[in-house]
Amino acid sequence: MLDLLRCVNPHEDTWLVASLKAISNRFVLDGTLGCPVCHAQYAIRNGVADFRQSGDAGHTLPEHFPLSFSRDELAVRMGAFLNATEPGATLVLGGSWAEAAQEVSVMTETRVLAVNPGRAVEESETVGLLRVSRDLPLAPGSVLGVAVDETISPEMISSALRALRPGGRLVGPMSIDPPLDLTVLARDERHWVAERAMEMVSLRRAGTTE
């Protein structure tokens, strides 16, 4: 999933260059991701890519809210919330949602990026691990769905919206208003589910010109 990762600094979109130091069973354990534009570097340690910005890397990550469901039940809910019916697509699960990353990946046959996960969440062939502070380091329009909880910063919603592809869904906490660009499909006392509109395709009769 390295191909989806991007620099969090504001400049033109470009791939990151990977320098790998340790690999085990095809998993990257240690290395560096470098930006060819601004020359920022992001460390990969123990399989976790660290995109926390200057001054944030030393801060303790916020505590996750306790899970109200088992991981399998949470995976079923996530699959429904994010309409994860496309095998091979990529989902992003942040905070407490990330605790069920492996179960979601298996149940929906998707790739999952777990953002700021707890210690129990491990990397696998279909689950990647990220540490972030304010921005999701993802290519524009690259993911099918994003779910974040109360532990994320409000700024992260903007980068989540940017990473969401047309027709994709975003699950967010009630403490943060859903983006105006999205259509809210459902909400309860803790979360809302919203969807990005599909791109409109203009149709014209063959042989006609404007």
Describe the role of every protein-language-model region.
Residues 125-127, 171-192:
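Conserved class I S-adenosyl-L-methionine
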Residues 154-170, 174-176:
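A short glycine-rich, Lys/Arg-flanked "PGG" loop and its adjoining helix->strand segment in the class I
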Residues 88-92, 110-114, 143-149, 167-173:
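Hydrophobic beta-strand segments of well-ordered beta-sheets in folded domains
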Residues 17, 51-52, 61-90, 96-107:
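Conserved alpha-helix/loop element of class I SAM-dependent methyltransferases that forms part
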Residues 1-64, 188, 201-210:
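N-terminal auxiliary segments of SAM/dcSAM-dependent transferases
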Residues 87-89, 124-162, 206-209:
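A short acidic, Gly/Pro-enriched loop at the edge of an enzyme's catalytic core
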Residues 95-99, 150-154, 176:
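Short beta->alpha connector loops
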Residues 86-139:
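Class I SAM-dependent methyltransferase SAM/SAH-binding core
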